[in-house]
């Protein structure tokens, strides 16, 4: 679920209000775009929901990430470029180290790395345009005791360095 709350009177805060989410979703990783939009990633459904923070936090769109660049990107944490024209997102791997519900595999992705999303409409929409792949192959025994190589890369954190 996605919640909004005021921080104008810190250290006191207002009671959080639910502004979005969905059954079967996994809201995970958020980034503010241009001071107007909030992007909330959903690892399990490969989506980013877009909320207009200047207009009552209403949901104004959904960005579908699965497609030509990756069939199962599993977006995690995100951060925007200094000029807000791109968002960089950690994409989970096929063998997540943490946060995976084994019944639904909500944290499993097919393309571990850093996704590059081109921001459109001032932050109202975007498109996954490329991935900088990350790989860490490791040998381990399969269920029959045979040695096999498995992808173990599982990025799930990111921060854009602003100079």
Q: Where in the sequence are the language-model features?
A:
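Predominantly soluble domains enriched in secretory-pathway, periplasmic, or organellar proteins
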Residues: 1-163
């Amino acid at each position: 679920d996605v919640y909004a709350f005021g921080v104008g009177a810190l250290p006191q805060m207002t009671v959080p209000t639910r502004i979005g989410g969905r059954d079967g979703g996994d809201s995970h990783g958020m980034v503010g775009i241009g001071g107007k939009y909030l992007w909330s990633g959903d690892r399990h459904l490969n989506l980013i929901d877009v909320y207009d923070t200047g207009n009552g936090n209403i949901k104004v769109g959904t960005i579908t990430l699965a497609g030509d660049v990756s069939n199962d990107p599993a977006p995690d944490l995100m951060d925007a470029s200094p000029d807000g024209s791109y968002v960089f997102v950690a994409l989970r791997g096929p063998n997540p180290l943490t946060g995976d519900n084994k019944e639904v595999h909500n944290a499993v992705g097919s393309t571990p790395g850093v996704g590059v999303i081109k921001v459109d409409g001032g932050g109202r929409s975007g498109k996954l345009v490329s991935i900088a792949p990350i790989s860490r192959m490791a040998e381990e025994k399969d269920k029959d005791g045979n040695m096999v190589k498995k992808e173990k890369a599982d990025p799930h954190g990111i921060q854009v360095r602003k100079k």
